[in-house]
UniProtKB/Swiss-Prot annotation:
Phylogenetic lineage: Bacteria, Bacillati, Mycoplasmatota, Mycoplasmoidales, Mycoplasmoidaceae
PROSITE patterns membership: PROKAR_LIPOPROTEIN
GO cellular component, one term: plasma membrane
Protein name: Uncharacterized lipoprotein MG040
Membrane topology: Lipid-anchor
Length: 591
């Protein structure tokens, strides 16, 4: 996972390495396999340990290139796992280890005849900042690469890079770079909702005590938890959005799905929630709110500490990740979201070893498709889903972002909300660049299914909710009638008023929105809004440490909350002219 979020550096920079000789290094850098492809666009993977067919970061970015050529030129590029695709044969390269290595690789790709380099991962930033800087040591590289375009994936270029004591390492003018970072919190909001639905639809399985400690006190509850490798803005963003998705399910959707646990003395018949929604086959267990559980033994009170929710590294052998997984299994947690890179595999392994009825929610890419995903223990008891330990994931759709930026550069105008050179773009729910993986579509329910939303295109979501509040009790539906992303209109295609669009509106602040929290009228209140007015669910970034309910305690112990931009931002000073794409060939062929 990238450690750079929306232009805010959250990782320790590597030591600065002089690379004035990088032009010479072009001739000294190993070129890998013999070139057999001539492509206008090449992929540069994150580091020298990365590969192309990783079913993750590299492959998703490459799929964006493939999709662009297919849609724009009708040309089929080889699939990522094709034996034809060797490193260095014209479609992808590894970057090397040092700053000078990376810049040399840029020049190698340019010398291959490629016009655009898709550079993936936060660790590409230093070299990109260098070749667009005013630093005299990199002027030859800046001139050499001035007519080469770059797409920086999962990061953002800064005008002043790596400031220390007020002095930047580089002052950059990225006239030939278009970058994209991702609102992963918005995407994981959708995943939180889908997780709550998934657990409820499979109550019989998840309320089974298999694999739990006999000391578990959560025997009749549906519970979730998660942890990060290190508490950084980029990782806490995932955790925050996921928790808010659970909160929206608990505080808003819940009211319209079941009346089993409502107080009938305080709720009139006309206000009672929809008949028997999300109940298991025996008709007895109604929908449940989802409770958050701390990995620390004995700490499930009103306040929990973020330090208990971090393993301390992103290592694939981190022992604390194993400890956290086992503590959560002991507590009977039904779903865990590990935001710690390869430590997802460690959690899956512990669940399989203990035959626990616990799901793992994937992160970044569709991890349910990876080889690490195996059959869930007693899988036949799961009524819905893929019957694997990882049912679905919270994703960054790198393929969508890469294809959109390539299309923008080719056409010379914004495509899918993405801008070209000189812009830091943002992947959002609105432009289909973050969200839940396709395997989770059957659990991503319409967030306002009880409302008449036919007029949502003409008004904000919150205004539509207000306008339809009086008739909401008349729109009762059985579960089979509640639209999901999978079954809406018999299609998964996104449209102007589809379920994804409704979530995008829900997560976008408007002038007519009311505050999500009671705290807007009483600063001492810190509860999620639970009144009939469903409120403003725009994610600010610090909700982990501010807002709570009886099921979702406040997190303490961190100030590393992210700040967000919500749309593409021009990072060029006035008067700077972006690089021209008129000479780009936009072609691909096998030699």
């Amino acid at each position: 996972m990238g450690k750079l979020l929306f232009g805010k550096l959250v990782f320790k920079k590597s030591l600065f390495l002089l690379s004035g000789m990088s032009s010479l290094a072009v001739f000294l850098t190993a070129c890998g396999a013999t070139k057999i492809f001539d492509s206008s666009v090449q992929l540069l993977v994150s580091d020298n340990f990365s590969t192309l067919a990783d079913k993750s970061f590299s492959q998703m970015s490459y799929e964006g290139i493939r999709s662009f050529f297919k849609k724009s030129k009708g040309v089929d590029l080889p699939e990522a796992d094709s034996s034809q695709l060797q490193e260095g044969n014209g479609l992808w390269k590894r970057p090397g280890f040092t700053l000078s290595d990376r810049i040399a690789t840029f020049n190698n790709i340019k010398n291959d005849g490629s016009d655009v380099i898709v550079a993936t991962g936060f660790n590409q930033q230093e070299s990109l900042q260098a070749i667009t800087s005013d630093d005299i040591r990199f002027q030859s590289d800046k001139e050499s690469l001035a007519k080469t375009g770059f797409i920086f994936v999962d990061g953002a270029i800064e005008k002043e890079f790596n400031k220390r004591n007020g002095v930047p390492q580089f002052k950059s003018t990225p006239t030939n770079i278009s970058s994209v970072a991702f609102r992963s919190d918005d995407g994981s909001f959708l995943t939180g909702v889908a997780t709550a639905v998934y657990l409820n639809l499979n109550q019989e399985y998840f309320l089974d005590k298999s694999g739990w400690s006999t000391n578990s006190s959560n025997n009749n509850e549906l519970t979730v938890s998660g942890f990060v490798g290190i508490a950084l803005p980029s990782t806490l963003s995932f955790l925050n959005g996921f928790r808010l998705g659970i909160a929206y399910f608990n505080e808003v959707i819940y009211k319209h799905l079941s009346d089993a646990q409502d107080s009938s003395a305080q709720v009139t018949t006309s206000k009672q929630t929809v008949l028997k929604q999300l109940q298991v086959a025996n008709g007895e267990k109604r929908i449940k709110k989802i409770k958050w559980i701390s990995p620390k033994q004995g700490s499930d009170g009103e306040t929990i500490n973020i330090q208990d929710h971090q393993s301390g590294s992103f290592s694939d052998t981190e022992p604390r990740a194993i400890t956290i997984a086992n503590n959560l299994i002991d507590k009977g947690v039904n779903a865990i979201i590990p935001i710690a890179g390869p430590q997802t595999n460690l959690v899956v392994t512990q669940i399989a070893r203990r035959q626990a009825h616990t799901a793992v929610i994937g992160v970044d890419s569709a991890q349910e498709l990876l080889d690490i995903n195996i059959d869930a223990p007693n899988k036949d008891k799961l009524k819905m889903g893929n019957k694997k330990i990882i049912p679905f994931s919270s994703i960054k759709a790198l393929d969508v972002a890469v294809e959109s930026i390539l299309s923008t550069l080719e056409k010379g105008s914004s495509q899918n909300g993405y801008q070209g050179f000189g812009y830091n773009n943002i992947g959002t729910v609105k432009n289909n660049s973050v969200g839940v993986s396709e395997a989770g579509y059957e659990f991503l329910i319409d967030p306002v299914f009880w409302k008449n939303t036919s007029s949502m295109q003409a008004m904000s979501l919150s205004a539509s909710l207000k306008a339809n509040a009086a008739s909401s009790s008349d729109n009762k539906k059985k579960l089979s009638e509640v639209a999901t992303k999978k079954n809406e209109n018999g299609s998964t295609k996104n449209g102007s008023n589809d379920i994804i669009d409704k979530y995008a509106k829900l997560l976008t602040k408007s002038s007519s929105s009311t505050s999500m929290r009671n705290g807007s009228s009483d600063s001492n209140q810190q509860n999620f809004k639970t009144t009939d007015n469903d409120g403003d669910w725009t994610i600010v970034g610090d909700e982990l440490g501010k807002y709570k309910s009886s099921e979702l305690p406040i997190f303490t112990g961190s100030s590393s909350y992210p700040t967000f931009q919500t749309e593409a931002q021009n990072v060029l000073d006035g008067g700077a002219n972006v690089a021209s794409t008129q000479g780009f060939k936009w072609s691909f062929k096998q030699i």
